[in-house]
């Protein structure tokens, strides 16, 4: 029995049934790979320096920070 091919079902016909895609907003240079970042850590939007802060933690705080 063959596996169904992606994009041939109901979701292919109706875009509202497709899973949501993650979209990063901001400068592309800010989202570089971890090995390209400074070994001393990154600056998060709160202005504090976190040693080896994970990129997704900074992105999360940018999304939910009050301005």
Swiss-Prot record:
Region annotation (Disordered) maps to 1-22
What family does this belong to? Answer: Belongs to the FAM27 family.
Q: What is this protein called?
A: Protein FAM27A/B/C
Q: Which organism is it from?
A: Homo sapiens
């Amino acid at each position: 029995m063959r596996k169904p091919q992606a994009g041939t079902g109901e979701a292919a016909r109706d875009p509202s049934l497709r899973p949501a895609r993650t979209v990063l907003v901001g400068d592309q240079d800010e989202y570089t790979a971890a090995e390209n970042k400074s070994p001393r850590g990154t600056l998060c939007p709160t202005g504090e320096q976190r040693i080896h802060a994970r990129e997704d933690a900074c992105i999360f705080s940018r999304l939910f920070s009050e301005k």
